[in-house]
Design a protein with these regions (language model features):
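Extracellular ligand-binding/catalytic regions of CAZymes and related secreted enzymes
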Residues: 6, 24, 30-41, 45, ...
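A glycine-rich, often tryptophan-bearing local segment used as a flexible ligand/cofactor-contacting loop or short
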Residues: 1-85
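Catalytic beta-strand/loop cores that center a nucleophilic Ser/Cys/Thr
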Residues: 49-127, 132, 136-139
Length: 157
């Protein structure tokens, strides 16, 4: 149904933990890639990073381990979300790294570790915005409202 909704010009907002990690089958992973325009990168996994020396254009490869953090930048804002158990609010203890896939998809929010916290997609057919942590876990209420308004503006403009 979501595929059909997207093909008819839908606007999709998904926030929460486990968006990527719960999608295990080939069909589910194809849905992430084909419709939500993202791929899941497990926290703690090793990736190859390529550094280019601007002076002589030499390329050096190194292994990096990717992580999330409770500090996020995006939509012109910097904010934190609850990521540890506490008495005020439930915590997003398993935020996810979601990477953009294909044309017109991009990192819309970034953890301060440099990994992607949200993927936005805008085509002539439909739009989507997928977060790797729950929107409602953003600590500051006015910031949470600003983030939601920014997402809604992206989805509807």
């Amino acid at each position: 149904r979501i595929r059909q909704y997207a093909s008819q010009g839908g606007r999709i907002l998904i926030s929460g933990s486990y968006t990527g990690s719960d999608m295990q089958t080939e069909e589910e992973q194809a849905f992430l890639s084909d419709i939500l325009k993202l791929s899941y990168e497990p926290t703690g996994s090793t990736v190859i990073t390529r550094d280019i020396n601007p002076e002589d254009s030499t390329v050096t490869e190194r292994e990096s381990i990717v992580y999330t953090s409770p500090n996020v930048t995006g939509l012109g804002l910097q904010f934190s979300y609850y990521n540890e158990l506490n008495a005020q609010h439930y915590a997003a203890t398993h935020p996810e790294i979601l990477k953009p896939v294909g044309n017109y998809a991009f990192t819309a929010m970034q953890y301060d570790t440099g990994t992607s916290a949200a993927v936005a997609y805008k085509s002539t057919t439909y739009r989507s915005f997928v977060m790797g942590f729950p929107l409602e876990c953003i600590i500051d209420e006015s910031t949470r409202t600003s983030v939601l308004l920014g997402i809604l503006k992206f989805l509807t403009d």
